[in-house]
């Protein structure tokens, strides 16, 4: 119904609507989701549905704003394939992105915007032949595919990690954890440890249960079985909520104050005055302190919520896709901040599909697949 909504408003023939919807679903690899309720889908799956809706509209121009955000590598490949098909069909395709690697060989022109104006323009070939030093000086994300999750931690540490999800002296841990939505099992028998002083990244395909796992860990969702412990002792949902700071995937749902400075004090009353100003400065937000949080860009909202999580000084900090909508400079800033939080003794848990980010910060990587976990 969602894919056909636009065409229905234009009174198109039902047979045409069915054909357009089926074609868009096939292009985006969501045919198996067509009978699912939107409320049951993961953030990445919803992103693919939104793109399929745009494809099914039949419009001659497609504007895609951060289409790769929240998507796993396979889903990004689906997006690339769909954009290529539209290009071959003669449509005008405009993509606004920070994650640039998947558009290599596809983009015909690349425009760099700064301060509301076009600063530079390249042909696709010239842009993707840019040297690494030049790329970084322009504040651009990597132009090279960061590879599969298994390569992320290896590329940072120069060696493979231990093939185990368990460690000694874990700050947060789960044993035989199970979670179901009605008769749908998300995961079962899951064992994992999250040590203090380290950054643990959780990867996996869209719909594998990553967001569900962190919601269960921090006490926002009730697992159907198993035990979750803090510092080696079983902890109730209330205890976990008090110990965890969570940055959700949809940051707009975590903004409540009428100023950025006020946002910091909601969970940390001492984040005022110079302390609050310094925290905003650390995230390049000091010049926006009097702005209403909901007036910020997506990347600015992301950084504000991370700053608010840091202000709480809680022993467990959980972030769900913290680098969506973030450029290279701010990605480096978030990486450095998470490293400081971990060095101060917190267990940092990050759900991410962003290989560039994970390769820069992850000490450990846990890869989820439906109904199982591997390290």
Regions found by a protein language model. Give the residues of each.
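Hydrophobic anchor residue at the start of the ABC signature
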Residues: 51, 306-307
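ABC ATPase C-loop
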Residues: 55, 309-310
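Conserved ABC ATPase signature
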Residues: 37-41, 292-296, 300
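Helix-to-loop junction immediately C-terminal to a conserved catalytic motif
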Residues: 218
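H-loop/switch region of ABC-family ATPase nucleotide-binding domains
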Residues: 97-98, 352-353
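Conserved ABC ATPase "signature" region
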Residues: 16-33, 273-288
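Catalytic Walker B motif of ABC-type/P-loop ATPase nucleotide-binding domains
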Residues: 62-65, 317-320
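Conserved ABC transporter NBD signature motif
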Residues: 226-240
């Amino acid at each position: 119904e969602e894919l056909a909504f636009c065409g229905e408003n234009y009174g198109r023939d039902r047979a045409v609507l069915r054909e357009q919807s089926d074609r868009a679903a096939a292009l985006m690899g969501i045919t198996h989701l067509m009978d699912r309720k939107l409320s049951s889908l993961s953030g990445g799956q919803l992103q693919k549905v939104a793109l399929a809706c745009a494809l099914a509209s039949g419009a001659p121009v497609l504007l895609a704003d951060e289409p790769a955000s929240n998507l796993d590598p396979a889903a990004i490949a689906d997006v690339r394939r769909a954009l290529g098909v539209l290009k071959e069909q003669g449509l005008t395709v405009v993509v606004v992105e920070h994650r640039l690697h998947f558009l290599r060989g596809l983009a015909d022109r690349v425009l760099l915007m700064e301060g509301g104006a076009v600063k530079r323009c390249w042909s696709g070939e010239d842009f993707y032949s840019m040297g690494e030093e030049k790329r970084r000086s322009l504040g651009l994300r990597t132009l090279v595919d960061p590879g599969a999750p298994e390569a992320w931690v290896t590329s940072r540490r120069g060696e493979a990690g231990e093939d185990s999800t368990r460690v000694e002296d874990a700050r947060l841990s789960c044993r035989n954890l199970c979670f179901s939505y009605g008769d749908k099992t998300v995961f079962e028998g899951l064992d994992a440890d999250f040590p203090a002083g380290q950054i643990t990244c959780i990867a996996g395909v869209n719909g594998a249960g990553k967001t569900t796992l962190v919601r269960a860990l921090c006490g926002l969702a009730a697992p159907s079985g198993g035990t979750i412990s803090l510092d080696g002792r079983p902890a109730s949902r209330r205890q976990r909520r008090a110990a965890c700071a969570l940055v959700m995937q949809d940051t707009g749902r975590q903004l409540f104050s009428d100023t950025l400075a006020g946002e910091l004090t909601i969970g940390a009353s001492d984040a005022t005055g110079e302390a609050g100003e310094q925290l905003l400065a650390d995230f390049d937000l000091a010049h926006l302190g009097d702005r209403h949080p909901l007036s910020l860009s997506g990347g600015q909202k992301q950084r504000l919520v991370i700053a608010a999580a840091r202000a709480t000084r809680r022993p467990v900090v959980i972030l769900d896709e913290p680098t969506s909508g973030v450029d290279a400079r701010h990605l480096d800033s978030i990486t450095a901040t998470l490293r400081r939080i971990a060095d101060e003794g917190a267990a940092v848990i990050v759900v991410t599909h962003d290989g560039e980010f994970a390769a820069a910060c992850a000490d450990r990587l846990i890869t989820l697949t439906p109904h199982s976990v591997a390290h």
